[in-house]
């Protein structure tokens, strides 16, 4: 029987080429990436950890902005791509195959900031991941993460959605979207907003700013076409908190 870590890694190992084609390397292609980087603020000289770093898109942007970056992921396949990019265009990034939910993860390490762009939805053990973040973050250090907005379903079956249409907001757990996108291939963990917030509180992380980035113009047009009589709800949710 596969462990939780092996299951999570296999989801992305099996779709590497598809994932790389869809996501690419440009941070400007995704609304949440810009918001996440803005909330992290000036990272020059900071030591920053990128959790669920994948092929290194956010890690490389952080390094370009002057951070000393370590990226962790459980998919060795995606890390191989990140390392290959680093060899071809060195930015001083260290990539590690680490289970961020383990109580032994990154033992003895300390970071000024931690970023996680959409990765929490892929991690089955939310509490374990946040516990690790709180443990490695220095006092007053920043943790910024982005997720699909947990409060609203997608406007149709093909839309990004934190939870399956028809199942209900309170039905937490892993689910597989019925569309050809990434979440239709690797699935996603849905949690209520209170689950996210209470997990932060439990690990002494205090929220000091949130953002709900506007969707891309293409997404907005699709929202309006599907829901012409209602104001389209937000799609994304980005949170910054600090260790106290």
Segments the model singles out, each with a brief description of its role:
Residues 49-51, 55-103:
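Class I SAM-dependent methyltransferase SAM/SAH-binding core
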Residues 105-114:
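A short acidic, Gly/Pro-enriched loop at the edge of an enzyme's catalytic core
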Residues 2-44, 57, 61, 78-81, 142-176, ...:
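Conserved class I S-adenosyl-L-methionine
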Residues 187-210:
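Short alpha-helix
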């Amino acid at each position: 029987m596969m462990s939780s870590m092996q299951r999570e890694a296999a989801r992305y190992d099996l779709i590497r080429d598809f994932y790389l084609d869809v996501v690419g390397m440009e941070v400007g292609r995704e609304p949440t990436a810009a918001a996440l980087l803005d909330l992290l603020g000036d990272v020059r000289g900071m030591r920053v950890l990128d959790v669920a770093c994948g092929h290194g898109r956010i890690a490389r942007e952080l390094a370009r902005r002057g951070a000393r970056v370590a990226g962790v992921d459980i998919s060795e396949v995606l890390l191989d791509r990140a390392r290959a990019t680093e060899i071809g265009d060195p930015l001083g990034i260290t990539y590690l195959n680490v289970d961020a939910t383990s109580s032994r993860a990154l033992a003895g390490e300390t970071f000024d900031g931690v970023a996680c762009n959409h990765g929490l939805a892929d991690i089955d053990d939310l509490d374990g991941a946040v516990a690790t973040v709180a443990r490695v973050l220095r006092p007053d250090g920043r943790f910024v993460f982005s997720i699909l907005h947990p409060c609203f379903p997608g406007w149709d079956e093909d839309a990004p959605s934190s939870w399956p249409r028809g199942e209900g907001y309170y039905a937490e757990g892993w689910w597989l979207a019925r569309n050809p996108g990434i979440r239709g291939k690797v699935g996603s963990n849905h949690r209520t907003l209170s689950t996210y917030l209470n997990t932060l509180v439990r690990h002494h992380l205090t929220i000091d700013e949130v953002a709900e980035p506007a969707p891309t113009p293409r997404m907005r047009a699709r929202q309006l076409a599907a829901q012409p009589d209602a104001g389209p709800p937000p799609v994304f949710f980005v949170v910054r908190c600090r260790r106290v």
